[in-house]
């Protein structure tokens, strides 16, 4: 899987504990993809928690392609992720920008579909996601970024549900790198 520094290996273990405690549920759920599932992961209780966001941000920063000059994601799930990663990067002396991708282009003002600093064309941007199922949200973000002449090589996610997202992204020449897969939750005999 991913080879992390010793510190981030510990961060990853602590993050999994937090996700199991605050984000994972068993039951009958309809996912954003429209699929039914007996397992639900809502990472927002962890990504909107100071310690959780710190863990995610450190792990994403180490996992991210070093050629990336910005991170981006579709609002709302990616909002804390992109903010956390650029703040963590800044604390380490790294320059990284962030873009928030609107689900719908504004109907007023500048009619922007992207929010954030003005970046040069062909800037390499990494897309951040909380959970990837079919990768529909990530693909929407990638298309919007590519329409604006940015280069997207990868998507980083907290969890890959292993339901076709990896393959869908591969069709768009995008590498999916995930901190965890659904198996990590199932192997830990989560009883929620």
Curated annotation (Swiss-Prot):
Q: Name one GO biological process term.
A: 'de novo' UMP biosynthetic process
Q: Identify the cofactor(s).
A: Mg(2+)
Keyword Cell inner membrane applies: no
The EC number(s) given in the record are 2.4.2.10
> Which pathway is this protein engaged in?
Pyrimidine metabolism; UMP biosynthesis via de novo pathway; UMP from orotate: step 1/2
Q: Which GO terms describe its molecular function?
A: magnesium ion binding; orotate phosphoribosyltransferase activity
Q: Enzyme class, one word?
A: transferase
Detail which positions bind 5-phospho-alpha-D-ribose 1-diphosphate.
102-103, 106, 129-137
Disulphide bonds annotated for this chain are none
Keywords attached to this Swiss-Prot or TrEMBL record, sorted alphabetically, are: Glycosyltransferase, Magnesium, Pyrimidine biosynthesis, Transferase
What this protein is reported to do is described as: Catalyzes the transfer of a ribosyl phosphate group from 5-phosphoribose 1-diphosphate to orotate, leading to the formation of orotidine monophosphate (OMP).
Give the family per the record.
Belongs to the purine/pyrimidine phosphoribosyltransferase family. PyrE subfamily.
Question: How does this chain assemble?
Answer: Homodimer.
Quote the NCBIfam families the UniProt record gives.
pyrE
What this protein is called in its record is Orotate phosphoribosyltransferase
Which species does the entry assign this protein to?
Prochlorococcus marinus (strain MIT 9515)
Mind giving the lineage of the organism this protein is from? Answer: Bacteria, Bacillati, Cyanobacteriota, Cyanophyceae, Synechococcales
């Amino acid at each position: 899987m991913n080879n992390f520094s010793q510190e981030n290996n510990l961060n990853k273990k602590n993050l999994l504990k937090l996700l199991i405690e605050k984000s994972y549920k068993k039951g009958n759920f309809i996912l954003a993809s429209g699929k039914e599932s007996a397992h639900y992961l809502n990472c927002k209780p962890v990504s909107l928690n100071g310690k959780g966001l710190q863990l995610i941000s450190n792990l994403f920063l180490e996992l991210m392609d070093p050629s990336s000059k910005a991170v981006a994601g579709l609002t709302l799930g990616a909002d804390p992720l992109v903010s956390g990663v650029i703040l963590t990067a800044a604390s380490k002396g790294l320059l990284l920008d962030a873009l928030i991708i609107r689900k719908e282009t504004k109907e007023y003002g500048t009619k922007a579909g992207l929010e954030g600093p003005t970046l040069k064309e062909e800037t390499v941007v990494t897309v951040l996601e909380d959970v990837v199922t079919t990768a529909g949200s990530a693909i929407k973000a990638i298309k919007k970024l590519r329409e604006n002449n940015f280069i997207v090589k990868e998507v980083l996610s907290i969890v890959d549900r292993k339901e076709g997202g990896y393959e869908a992204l591969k069709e768009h020449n995008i590498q999916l790198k995930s901190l965890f897969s659904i198996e990590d939750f199932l192997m830990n005999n989560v009883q929620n």
